[in-house]
């Protein structure tokens, strides 16, 4: 994903250490896309992949079982659902090595793609699908073959989930320990957004996929046939046939609207482990929260 796989695994364990949840297994998946060389996003997330926080590694060895082995074993035991917050390489490998196991996945929520919003690594492509479009294409085609729909949490909705300085200060007031941790791991990301998009704050993409998985009413959208461009100038673009031009089976639910207030209540209730009554100022803070505009777009030509 955004960081090389070993670094990403260590970062996951650093966060779990902070949460006192090192009992949660972290497994290493593919270290490169199916066909092209790997391109990281450390320019966005810092040299350590975690906002240049340079936190100490968690003690103990990494799990030696591969992500592919774990998925195959787990799906033989029971049906599962997945939240994919990176490129879809591991799921493509699963299809190629054990299609029956993949077919036992009940639900896939994927943070990736974009419908009407501009891309973040090309004019038309979002990073996760751009990084491995062949893998994304394999997964979307398999969903069509199965008669199922992947849930696409794309930039149209994630760009409306902006952690602003006011929200971060609010978190620090409510819980100085958690607030300090979040500030430390997002400072580089805040600076990146200002430098490249003149946005005061940072878009927090992945938590929206988790929120939508837990409560499908956080986002709204429509079903459509989606294909992923694998090469050329549009490489990685999620081509959404919103008007049934091709008359192909709908293999995706494309979310294009998000209840920002509902999301932030869910987000803060969980990371701060508090009830809604403590968040009495949140509505006020979100009143003018439309940092990117209603459709996740901004004019950044300045």
Each language-model region and where it sits:
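Active-site rim/loop-helix segments in enzyme catalytic domains that contact anionic ligands
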Residues: 1-48
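Active-site histidine-anchored catalytic micro-motif
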Residues: 1-14, 54-160, 165
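Short, mixed-charge aromatic SLiMs
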Residues: 4-7, 34-35, 114-118, 227-244
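A residue-level signal for conserved active-site and pocket-lining positions in enzyme catalytic cores
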Residues: 26, 139, 210
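Short, surface-exposed amphipathic charged segments that create phosphate/polyanion-binding patches used
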Residues: 39-47, 122-126, 167-170, 243
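Short, basic/glycine-rich phosphate-binding loops at helix/coil junctions
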Residues: 44-54, 189, 243-246
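Short glycine/proline- and acidic residue-enriched helix-loop micro-motifs
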Residues: 49-59, 193-196
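Conformational coupling and interaction surfaces
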Residues: 130-134, 147-302
């Amino acid at each position: 994903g955004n960081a090389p796989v070993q670094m990403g695994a260590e970062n996951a364990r650093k966060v779990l250490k902070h949460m006192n949840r090192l009992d949660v297994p972290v497994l290493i998946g593919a270290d490169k896309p199916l066909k092209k060389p790997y391109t990281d996003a450390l320019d966005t997330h810092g040299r350590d992949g975690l906002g240049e926080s340079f936190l100490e590694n968690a003690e103990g060895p990494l799990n030696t079982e591969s992500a592919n082995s774990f998925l195959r074993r787990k799906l033989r035991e029971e049906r599962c659902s997945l939240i994919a917050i990176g490129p879809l390489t591991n799921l493509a490998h699963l299809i190629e090595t054990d299609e029956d196991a993949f077919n036992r996945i009940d639900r896939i929520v994927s943070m990736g793609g974009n419908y009407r919003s501009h891309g973040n690594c090309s004019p038309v492509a979002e990073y996760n699908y751009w990084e491995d479009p062949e893998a994304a294409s394999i997964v979307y085609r398999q969903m069509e073959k199965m008669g199922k729909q992947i849930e696409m949490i794309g930039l149209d909705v994630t760009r409306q989930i902006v952690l602003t300085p006011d929200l971060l200060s609010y978190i620090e007031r409510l819980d100085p320990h958690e607030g300090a941790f979040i500030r430390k791991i997002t400072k580089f990301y805040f600076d990146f957004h200002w430098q490249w998009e003149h946005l005061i704050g940072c878009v927090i993409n992945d938590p929206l996929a988790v929120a939508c998985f837990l409560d499908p009413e956080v986002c709204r959208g429509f079903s459509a046939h989606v294909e992923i461009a694998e090469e050329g100038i549009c490489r990685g673009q999620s081509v959404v046939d919103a008007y049934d031009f091709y008359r192909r089976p709908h293999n995706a639910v494309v979310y294009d609207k998000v209840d920002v207030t509902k999301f932030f209540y869910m987000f803060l209730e969980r990371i701060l482990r508090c009830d809604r009554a403590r968040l009495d100022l949140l509505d006020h803070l979100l009143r003018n929260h439309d940092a990117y505009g209603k459709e996740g777009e901004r004019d950044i030509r300045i």
